[in-house]
A protein has these predicted regions:
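RNase H-like, metal-dependent nuclease domains and their acidic two-metal-ion catalytic environment used
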Residues: 1-54, 64, 77-149
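Short, charged, surface-exposed secondary-structure boundary motifs
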Residues: 58-66
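Active-site proximal helix-loop segment of RNase H-like, two-metal nucleases, encompassing DDE(D)
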Residues: 65-74
């Protein structure tokens, strides 16, 4: 939450930059929709941005890659209860071309999947950085424990 009666996007951007300051961030991958405040703050801080739309053609490969990392025991979330809850709120949507993306399950649309969506976004950025799926990322979830085979 932010102080006041409305969401303070500059406050949120400032908090994000404070967290990112604890890590060696080379680039931030963001959804361009409604990102003006974040984009401005990150540019001022000198953090390069890679914008990509949250559509199935962009999200299919990183969703498949995150699934591969989890099922292959190459990545886990350290039994984080919030991420466990968010995973339980996810379903996989598949289009007629076999592209996939995560969606909220229909049982309760109010439940959150933001942490899982952020993980897919991070995998997208990681794949862009190494230019191919496969392997094991150094880290893409704060506090996550990565297991290498």
């Amino acid at each position: 939450t932010t102080p006041g009666n409305v969401i303070d996007l500059e406050d949120i951007a400032g908090r994000m930059l404070a967290i990112l300051g604890q890590y060696k961030v080379r680039r931030a991958d963001i959804d361009p929709w409604n990102s003006v405040h974040v984009e401005s703050s990150f540019k001022k801080a000198g953090i390069p941005l890679n914008k990509f739309a949250q559509n199935i053609t962009h999200l299919s490969v990183p969703t498949q890659e995150l699934e591969r990392l989890i099922l292959g025991a190459e990545m886990n979330h350290g039994n984080d209860p919030v991420l466990t809850w968010m995973v339980s709120n996810c379903e996989v949507y598949r289009d007629s071309n076999d592209n996939i993306r995560i969606v909220k399950n229909l049982a309760n649309r109010r439940n959150k999947i933001d942490g899982i969506a952020a993980s897919v976004n991070a995998v997208f950025g990681w794949i862009q950085t190494i230019n191919k799926p496969g392997g094991v990322p150094y880290i893409f979830l704060p506090g996550a424990k990565l297991i290498t085979a």
